[in-house]
A protein has these predicted regions:
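N-terminal strand-loop-strand
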Residues: 137-179, 205-206, 229
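Cys/His-rich short segments
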Residues: 110-155
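Glycine-rich phosphate/ribose-binding loops and adjacent secondary-structure elements
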Residues: 171-172, 186, 190
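Conserved small/polar residues in nucleotide/adenosyl-binding loops
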Residues: 252-260
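Hydrophobic alpha-helical positions that pack around
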Residues: 180, 194, 198
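Active-site-adjacent beta-strand/loop module that shapes the phosphate/pyrophosphate-binding cleft
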Residues: 215-240
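A gly/proline- and charged-residue-enriched helix-loop-helix capping module
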Residues: 85-111, 115-118
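N-terminal alpha-helical interaction blocks
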Residues: 1-97
Length: 260
C-alpha cells in the first residue's frame, strides 16, 4: 500500500494564480495511457514546459491540487506525441516510479475517466457542466449532480496459524496468486462483504476481522479496504469460473516480488 498520509499534497478544485507554472506537473492521458518522459529510463510525468511542445488536442483539463508547492493537473488529450515521450498504462509504472507519483497519476486518471463518462446527464440526457464549487458535474436542466465515481471493495488476508490463504483468479496465468478481494454490494457493510466474498470464492468461514487500512486503486475506480481475518471453518471449494485454485501457504515459503 502506498503512503496513507500524503502530507505534501493539498487537494484543490479552484485554480490559483501561480499554480500553472512551467514546472507544474501535467498527468496527461491519451485514453487510459499516461504520457511519460522516457529519457531517464524511469517513467516520469511531463511538466507544463514539456507540454508546450506537444501538438495535441486537449479534451479535458482539471486541477488536482498542489504537491510540494507545485501545481498538479489532469489532462485528457488526443494526437501524436513528440520524440522522447511514450504512453504507459498505470500498471506499467507501479513499482518503477515513486509511490507519490503513482498515487497522483491514479487520482488524475480517475478524474479524466469521470469527466469522459459524465458528459451528459444520466437522469434527463442534457449536457453536463462543471459545478461552480465542487469537483462535480451539474445538469442545469434537471439539477442532477454527478460526483466522481468510487467503487468500494475489500481485500482480505485470511490466516490459519503460520499459513495464509492465496488464490489464483481464473483469468490469471499459472503461478500468479493473490489474497481474496471483491466489490461491496448495495446494502452491505464492508464486514459483510468480507464474509460473503470468502465464502463465495473459496467456501470458507472466517472470524476475528481486523481492519488494516485503505487505498485508492485506479483500476478503474476502486477504494480498496484491507482486512486481516482468521480461518474459522470449512474446506476450500473454488468458485467455478472465478477462482482457478486456492491454497494455504506458509509465510516462510513466500518470496518477495521483483520490481515491474
Amino acid at each position: 500500500m502506498w503512503p496513507k498520509d500524503l502530507d505534501d499534497f493539498e487537494p484543490l478544485t479552484n485554480d490559483e494564480e501561480g499554480l500553472d507554472t512551467g514546472d507544474a506537473l501535467y498527468f496527461a492521458f491519451k485514453g487510459d495511457q499516461l504520457i511519460c518522459k522516457t529519457s531517464s529510463g524511469v517513467p516520469e510525468p511531463i511538466t507544463a514546459d514539456d507540454f508546450r511542445w506537444f501538438d495535441v488536442e486537449t479534451s479535458s483539463r482539471h486541477l488536482l491540487g498542489r504537491f510540494r508547492g507545485v501545481g498538479c493537473y489532469a489532462l485528457g488529450v488526443e494526437g501524436n506525441l513528440p520524440e522522447g515521450y511514450s504512453l504507459t498504462g498505470l500498471r506499467g509504472i507501479l513499482g518503477r516510479t515513486a509511490m507519490e507519483t503513482f498515487y497522483l497519476a491514479g487520482r488524475a486518471l480517475q478524474t479524466v475517466e469521470w469527466h469522459n463518462t459524465n458528459k451528459f446527464c444520466g437522469r434527463c440526457g442534457a449536457p453536463m457542466s462543471e459545478h461552480p464549487q465542487d469537483r462535480a458535474k451539474l445538469c442545469e436542466s434537471c439539477g442532477f449532480i454527478a460526483y466522481p465515481r468510487l467503487s468500494p471493495s475489500i481485500i482480505v488476508l485470511v490466516t490459519k496459524g503460520e499459513e495464509m490463504l492465496l488464490a489464483r483468479n481464473a483469468a490469471w496465468p499459472n503461478g500468479m496468486f493473490s489474497t481474496l478481494a471483491g466489490f461491496v454490494e448495495a446494502g452491505e457493510s464492508i464486514e459483510q462483504t468480507v464474509h460473503r466474498e470468502v465464502m463465495e470464492e473459496v467456501g470458507l468461514r472466517v472470524k476475528n476481522l481486523k481492519y488494516f487500512g485503505s487505498q485508492s486503486w485506479p483500476f478503474p475506480n476502486s477504494l480498496m479496504l484491507g482486512f486481516h481475518a482468521e480461518y474459522d471453518s470449512g474446506d476450500i471449494v473454488c468458485q467455478p469460473g472465478e477462482i482457478a485454485e486456492a491454497k494455504s501457504v506458509s509465510y516462510t515459503h513466500l518470496t518477495l516480488p521483483t520490481k515491474a
